[in-house]
Amino acid sequence: RPHRLNQPLLRMKVDVLLGLQWGDEGKGKIVDVLTPEYDVIARFQGGPNAGHTLEFDGIKHVLHTIPSGVFRPDTLNVVGNGVVIDPIIFKKEIDALVDLGVDVAGCLAISRKAHLILPTHRLLDAASEAAKGKAKIGSTLKGIGPTYMDKTGRNGLRVGDIESPHFESRYHTLRDKHVAMLGQFDGFEFRVDDAEWLEAVAFLRTLKLIDSEHDMNRALKAGQRILAEGAQGTMLDIDFGTYPFVTSSNTISAGACTGLGIAPNRVGEVFGIFKAYCTRVGSGPFPTEVQDELGERMRAEGHEFGATTGRP
């Protein structure tokens, strides 16, 4: 059926693109094709545990937190409130794009309500995974789970907090709490490096920070076309995936509502991406896994390795 692009302004909706399997379905390729049709590309969940591979001007790029419309100067790229951000990884990703001549600052906006991943979140992730032994869930060790735990536990730091003169005090309070928790893991050695993280936070302050829920709805009222870009896949949804071997956010289309601040009746087309065969990284049930030479051949010829972790 024809795509809904010329509808009346009052009926403008947010289209959603997401994976229907366990991630690595090829969402980046589809986003690359769809991006020219939209004015705004918005991430609504996940963080640097995601990896979208796309090709621009003949060069392959892997984006982890930044939306996939960043290579198009006329497209606004929004990191929504449902996303968790590691300032260090975020800065490195932006620096790499700037080196390629991309005007990231001119086309990127970050929600003040997005939560920050602290260095101690990554340490807690590693300590928790190590303590599980054979029962580990296959975490990417990016600190995603502990960050969402602090979010729901109402302890987290948000991007908007970096604008406060009391930010460093609040950071050290949460950091010290994490250090006390890390001390409870037997035999886990760690060292907290604050300097690089705080430097990356200072860089984050130079970027455009917005109240994304208001900006999204203003864009809709202005008749702008918006694509919500999902990460991971449906089978990794925190509620409806193969729990507990899942991610820590809602990867389904409804996640776009809470992750961007839009009403359910504002969701338009939903593009579900899947490939001819399933793949999965990490732990968890995988009923159709091929564990012989054929499986190895499919993995090799299909380059089936996680875009973020490189895991087969």
Where are these regions (language model features)?
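Non-transmembrane, aqueous-exposed alpha-helical and coiled segments at domain scale
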Residues: M12-P312
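Short, Lys/Arg-enriched N-terminal segments with co-localized hydrophobic residues
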Residues: R1-R11
